[in-house]
Amino acid sequence: VLTAEDKKLIQQTWGKLGGAEEEIGAEALWRMFHAYPPTKTYFPHFDLSQGSDQIRGHGKKVVAALGNAIKNLDNLSQALSELSNLHAYNLRVDPVNFKFLSQCLQVTLATRLGKEYSPEVHSAVDKFMSAVAAVLAEKYR
C-alpha cells in the first residue's frame, strides 16, 4: 500500500524527468530486452536495436501510461483498466514481464537521477511499480 509520503515521492520523482520520458521508456525497454531476452518474443516486428524508432515509440507509451497511473494513484485499477485488458486478452503477455520491466525502469531511473534516487525514492517507486504490475495482472485470474 502506498503511503502519503510514497505518493509524494513518486510524484516529485516523476516531475524530475523533465521531458526525458521517451528516452527513459526506451532505455528501460532496451535494458529489459537485454537482461531478459525472452521478452523480445512479444515484439517480433520491432527493430530492437538501441534507440530504434519502435523502441522509442513504445517506451513513450509505457511512460505515458505510468504518468497516467501517477495522476490516479488512488485508483490504479481504473486508470490501468484498458491496458490490463489489452495485455491480458489481446496480447497475452505473461505477467512476470511486468516485474522485469519494473526492475529495468528502476535501474534506468537510478542511473539518470543519481543521488536523487534515494533509498526512500527507490522504495516508493518499487511499491508503485509492484502495484502497477498487480493491477495489470488482475485480469489474468
From Swiss-Prot:
Gene Ontology MF terms in the entry: haptoglobin binding; heme binding; iron ion binding; organic acid binding; oxygen binding; oxygen carrier activity; peroxidase activity
Domain Globin as annotated: residue spans: 1-141
Annotated keywords: Heme, Iron, Metal-binding, Oxygen transport, Transport
GO CC, alphabetical: blood microparticle; haptoglobin-hemoglobin complex; hemoglobin complex
Expression sites (tissue/organ): Red blood cells.
Binding site for heme b: H58, H87
Alphabetical GO biological process terms: hydrogen peroxide catabolic process
Function statement: Involved in oxygen transport from the lung to the various peripheral tissues.
Subunit structure: Heterotetramer of two alpha-D chains and two beta chains.
Protein name: Hemoglobin subunit alpha-D
Name of the gene: HBAD
